């Protein structure tokens, strides 16, 4: 089901750890939205982060020019790339009541809904860790998790985001990411 652009701006907040590709996946989704004729703002939260430290990135997508220049405090969509972060950070904080929570986990949507007390909206889970290890042989969770967010929101076509990934990563790396994206779209659970 596609996100409702009638309300104006769709806001994303991404969570992960430094070095996991939080900023990259945020940019890839933003570039895909731009390719489909939308306006975007994509920006990371910088601080003293280092590899392994919790990081966040933000994305706004709109059919009209965006004139908001602040951090995203009440996102429509929260995407968590690192499955261990849900134990130390309330990634659902500020999520709108009708929002979408997308998490890389081997748990089902109901378990995540209960853990974070999400009453309305949508909870989407995908085992991006397993997908990444089986497809790429490395812990690159960001693209499969992003694919689950695309499936959950319909904000852009899966083909558009896949094309952006292939453009950024030509050759074998891009091909493996494409397989991981396709698998995540099939395996993501919406509840």
Predicted regions located by residue number:
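Active-site cofactor/cluster-binding pocket
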Residues: 1-191
């Amino acid at each position: 089901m596609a996100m409702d652009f009638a309300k104006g701006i769709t806001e994303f907040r991404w969570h992960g750890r430094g070095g996991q590709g939080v900023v990259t996946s945020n940019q890839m989704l933003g570039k895909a939205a731009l390719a489909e004729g939308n306006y975007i703002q994509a920006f990371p939260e910088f601080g003293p982060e280092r590899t392994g430290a919790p990081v966040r990135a933000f994305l706004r997508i709109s059919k009209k020019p965006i004139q908001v220049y602040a951090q995203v405090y009440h996102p429509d969509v929260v995407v968590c790339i690192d499955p261990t972060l849900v134990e130390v950070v309330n990634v659902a904080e500020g999520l709108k009541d009708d929002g979408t929570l997308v998490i890389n986990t081997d748990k089902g949507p109901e378990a995540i809904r209960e853990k974070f007390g999400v009453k309305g909206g949508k909870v989407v889970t995908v085992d991006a860790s397993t997908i990444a290890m089986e497809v790429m042989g490395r812990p690159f969770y960001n693209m499969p998790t992003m694919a689950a967010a695309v499936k959950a929101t319909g904000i852009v076509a899966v083909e558009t985001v896949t094309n952006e990934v292939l453009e950024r990563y030509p050759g074998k790396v891009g091909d493996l990411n494409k397989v991981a994206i396709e698998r995540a779209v099939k395996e993501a659970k919406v509840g």
